[in-house]
């Protein structure tokens, strides 16, 4: 009875924590919108200042924007994180030993989070990534208590 009650408490705790993870992932997704446009605007301004002209090569700016967007896009990582969150919830709600699988899921989520952190184009994203890492670490520690 005690183990079952403790198991239920851990399960509820993990579900609350993974919901926090989901909220942070959503926040990162929201903050990632408009970053490329912001970059293009800054780039155009910088080029005009350096060249001391109001005429800029729009094609060149567009090329740079594509390169920047390619390097900083976190769409794939966000998609995978959302997929991992769904799988995590399914595992937590399933019967049987899931500790090892959950541990691997957290490792994968950490990997995606680190990639997002290395591509972060704003302070808001960086802050959310740090919060996400803390939350994932807390989940990882909690998982150590289950089979």
Put a short name on every predicted segment.
Residues 1-147:
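N-terminal intrinsically disordered, cationic/polar leader segments
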């Amino acid at each position: 009875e005690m183990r079952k009650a403790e198991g239920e408490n851990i399960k509820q705790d993990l579900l609350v924590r993974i919901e926090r993870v989901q909220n942070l992932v959503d926040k990162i997704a929201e903050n990632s919108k408009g970053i490329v446009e912001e970059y293009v605007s800054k780039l155009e301004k910088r080029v005009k200042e350096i060249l001391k002209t109001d005429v800029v090569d729009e094609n060149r700016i567009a090329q740079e924007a594509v390169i920047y967007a390619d390097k900083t896009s976190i769409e794939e990582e966000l998609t995978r994180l959302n997929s991992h969150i769904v799988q995590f919830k399914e595992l937590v709600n399933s019967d049987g030993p899931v500790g090892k699988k959950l541990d691997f899921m957290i490792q994968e989520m950490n990997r995606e989070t680190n990639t997002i952190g290395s591509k972060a184009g704003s302070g808001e994203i960086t802050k959310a990534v740090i919060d996400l890492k803390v939350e994932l670490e807390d989940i990882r520690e909690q998982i150590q208590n289950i089979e």
